[in-house]
């Protein structure tokens, strides 16, 4: 079963890498993430193309995997116990209305984290999917969450909302954005 994999990411650092044409930075990442880069064909090439600012065409999925490596390199993976094996349709059908009712739907939604946009321009991929929430939107969502109490819901929904709030708290504490991958 698929699930959501979230990362706390200093978005500006990822954006600075893309198009930097810095071979030392690229080689450092390739050395540190050698095993992960070898898992799928084309990821190392996609990473190099991202560094060179050549992100048009090619296998979109390789670019998404390369982006995940950049998110892990510059940021950190966040706990995801409640969403590790969550169905995307269930998340959008059940959890997104909770976020809308709570008033945070303008800033964070499961649909946005599963079918959203990436923090950098890369070719489209059917899989893996994902999206991001910028640092300012993270702060705004937390302001709303901190002001109002969450209505009563079943344990599964509360667990997902708790995970998401934990991600937002961690990101806000470091002035970072949230990038999620769904696979």
List the predicted regions and their residue ranges.
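Acidic (Asp/Glu-rich) sequence patches and key acidic residues
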Residues: 1-166, 170-174, 182-183
């Amino acid at each position: 079963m698929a699930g959501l994999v979230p990362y706390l990411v200093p978005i500006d650092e990822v954006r600075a890498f893309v198009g930097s044409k810095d071979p030392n930075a690229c080689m450092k990442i390739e050395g540190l993430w050698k095993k992960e880069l070898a898992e799928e064909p084309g990821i190392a090439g996609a990473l190099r193309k991202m560094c060179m600012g050549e992100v048009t065409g090619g296998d979109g999925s390789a670019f998404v995997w390369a982006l995940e490596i950049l998110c892990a390199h510059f940021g950190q993976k966040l706990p995801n116990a409640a969403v590790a094996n969550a169905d995307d349709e269930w998340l959008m059908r059940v959890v997104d209305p909770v976020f809308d009712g709570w008033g945070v739907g303008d800033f964070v939604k499961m649909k946005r984290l599963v079918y959203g946009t990436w923090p950098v321009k890369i070719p489209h991929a059917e899989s893996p999917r994902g999206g991001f929430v910028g640092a300012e939107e993270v702060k705004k969502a937390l302001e709303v969450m901190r002001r109002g109490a969450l209505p009563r819901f079943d344990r599964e929904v509360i667990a997902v909302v708790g995970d998401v709030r934990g991600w937002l708290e961690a990101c806000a504490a470091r002035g970072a954005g949230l990038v999620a991958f769904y696979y």
